[in-house]
Design a protein with these regions (language model features):
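Structured catalytic core of nucleotide-sugar glycosyltransferases
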Residues: 1-132
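Hydrophobic helical membrane-anchoring modules
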Residues: 2-7, 182-327
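Amphipathic alpha-helical interaction elements
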Residues: 35, 171-175, 226-229
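Transmembrane helix-loop junction
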Residues: 60, 98, 149, 172, ...
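Solvent-exposed polar/charged
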Residues: 60-63, 88, 114, 118, ...
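Acceptor/aglycone-binding surface of glycosyltransferases and processive sugar-polymer synthases
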Residues: 73-89, 94, 103-181, 202-214, ...
Length: 327
């Protein structure tokens, strides 16, 4: 632990999972940018159970620079809980969240701070272009489409978790006690003054991406379940139409078999099963919402820490605001 000190103007939170090839370089780049644009700063690295030597490098970075702080989770808590928990542990008057792989350019830190000093409470990086596979882009497009259609607030295409958040924003969202915090959605829903900075997203500097198709799909479903309350009613209406259509198909199937052969029967059954699959999808999302309500009632913390390094003595443990108890 280090002695207590004044609140920094800027906190930069960098979640990591097996980023041994990037973590030292990203800290150096962020330090250079923050030193040139902020009155004072801290860097918080939150490690989500790395096994590739990332933690050893983090310890060395902390030994060399007291402004670098580390939170070591006792296990992997996923792409939503760990990064958000890191943001809640920051003490800066402005808090930036960014990836460790250089796909969120540190060079934008100065522009983020200028927008913030100009009155914006939230400054989001908006992905203008990205070198990604067609399949990955398609999955993201579908995810944004679902959120735009069924979500409870506007969707900002291309916006990621890369952004700056005012102290008031962080404290307000921490008080929401979300068990699976879809932070980028919460930011838009909260209605704080928002500014966007378009940027071209580069490729990873080194290492392999941890965001595969399955991970992105899981992330999108969690975000949709947590931000689309209208889905609670949708299956009621959908089930009525599906039931009527299924009844019509069952009545028409024997006729189709006699007149046109078994092909039409197979097509009818395929359509029927497809519609029921859609119904099950929405029911699954509702089940996810019910699970979130159950998790919220348990008051489980987002993350259980194994260790924290280089934090001042007055920040020796989890901040009280992250373990919110409802009356």
């Amino acid at each position: 632990m280090t002695p207590a000190h004044d609140t920094p103007e800027l906190s930069v939170v960098i979640p990591c999972f097996n980023e041994a090839q990037n973590v030292a370089a990203i800290c150096a780049a962020v330090t250079a940018e923050a030193t040139g644009h902020a009155e004072s700063h801290e860097i918080i690295l939150i490690d989500n159970g790395s096994t590739d030597g990332t933690r050893t490098i983090m310890r060395n970075l902390c030994a060399a620079d007291p402004r670098i702080r580390v939170i070591l989770n006792n296990r992997n808590y996923g792409q939503m809980r760990s990064p958000t928990y890191g943001l809640y542990q920051a003490e800066g008057r402005a808090v930036i969240g960014m990836c460790a792989d250089f796909q969120d350019p540190p060079a934008l830190i100065g522009e983020f701070l200028r927008k913030w000093r100009g009155g914006a409470q939230v400054v989001l990086g908006q992905r203008r272009s990205e070198k990604a596979s067609p399949l990955l882009r398609a999955v993201r497009h579908i995810g944004y489409g679902f959120l735009a259609r069924f979500g409870d607030y506007p969707v900002i295409p291309g916006a990621t978790g890369f952004g700056l958040f005012d102290r008031e924003v962080v404290d307000t969202l921490a008080a929401w006690n979300e068990p699976e915090p879809f932070f980028r959605g919460m930011v838009v829903e909260s209605g704080f003054r928002l500014a966007l900075i378009p940027f071209d997203r580069p490729e990873r500097a080194a290492g392999e991406s941890k965001n595969g198709i399955a991970a992105l799909a899981s992330f999108a479903l969690s975000g949709l379940a947590g931000s689309a309350k209208s889905l609670l009613r949708l299956p009621l209406f959908l089930s009525l139409y599906v039931g009527l259509l299924a009844l019509a198909l069952l009545i028409a199937a024997p006729v189709a078999l006699i007149v046109d052969g078994p092909v039409w029967v197979l097509l009818a059954l395929a359509l029927c099963f497809g519609l029921f699959a859609m119904l099950l999808l929405f029911l699954g999302l509702i089940g996810e919402q019910v699970r979130m309500l159950a998790e919220r009632s348990r008051n489980v913390p987002l993350v259980i820490e194994q260790e924290r390094i280089n934090f001042p003595v007055d920040r020796a443990g989890p901040a009280a605001r992250t373990l919110i108890r409802r009356p």
